[in-house]
Amino acid sequence: MEIRNRLAQLREKEEMALIAFIMAAVPDEDLCLDCIRALEQGGCDLLELGVPFTDPLADGEVIERFHHWGVRLGLNLKRGLDFAARVRAACQLPLILFSYYNPILQMGLDRFAGDCRSAGVDAVIVPDLPLDELGRLAGQGLELIPMLAPSSTLSRIQMAADLDPAFIYCVSVRGVTGVRSLPEMEIKDYLQKVRRVSTAPLALGFGISQPEQVRAFRGQADGVVIGSALAQIIEEYESRPALLPGMLEKRCQALKLLS
């Protein structure tokens, strides 16, 4: 089911979307697929699949370790897309590919767009591609998810709105991804600023890890992105792989209950 329909259904039920970020094929392909199935079973609504990259500037310490882990395993954009096709065959979640721009540029925009369509990718996030350059990929017929930050000007917010995206990824704080405390009132004011310009659903990410954070932004954001918190579970249970999917499922269930 594609992203817009899923988000519309959740909005009708007055539920927030739970968007899970997981690095493609880490620790290995089969275990990663088991983890993704567990996330789906636990109530995850959309899946964000990361492509390992050598210089992940937008990512914090935890996710950066997963990028380097994937690079050591020889993972790249082509293998990430091959794995995305396996994910598409294994689960029904709308699938968002998260990739930095340099690997896309090296692959070539035409080939990248075609391979995304072949793999069943529903949308793409490119965190280091400026909003005013997203048109390079939009012209390839891809669904692009723009990212905004609390520092985004009204003109940047309007630029994101003009893309008519399936949703806007609202970075919760200045800086990189990671588990942290969040300035609740500042974030709510920021979301309202975006809401005044765009009718697109808003997904809040960077720092969401606890059920109380999901509860705090219910009614303000249309979805939350969980990444570093899941990555920490994967790190903790890597040596006990039989337990890992179940722990991810439990975390998703706990977060989804409050969405």
From Swiss-Prot:
It holds the Pfam family Trp_syntA. Its EC number is 4.2.1.20. It catalyses: (1S,2R)-1-C-(indol-3-yl)glycerol 3-phosphate + L-serine = D-glyceraldehyde 3-phosphate + L-tryptophan + H2O. CDD domains: Tryptophan_synthase_alpha. Signal peptide: none annotated. The keyword Lyase applies. It comes from the Bacteria. Keywords: Amino-acid biosynthesis, Aromatic amino acid biosynthesis, Lyase, Tryptophan biosynthesis. GO terms for molecular function: tryptophan synthase activity. Pathway: Amino-acid biosynthesis; L-tryptophan biosynthesis; L-tryptophan from chorismate: step 5/5. GO terms for cellular component: cytosol. It is an enzyme of class 4 (lyase). The active site is at E48 (proton acceptor), D59 (proton acceptor). PANTHER family: TRYPTOPHAN SYNTHASE ALPHA CHAIN, CHLOROPLASTIC, TRYPTOPHAN SYNTHASE, ALPHA CHAIN. Tetramer of two alpha and two beta chains. NCBIfam families: trpA (TIGR00262). The alpha subunit is responsible for the aldol cleavage of indoleglycerol phosphate to indole and glyceraldehyde 3-phosphate. Belongs to the TrpA family. This is Tryptophan synthase alpha chain. The gene is trpA.
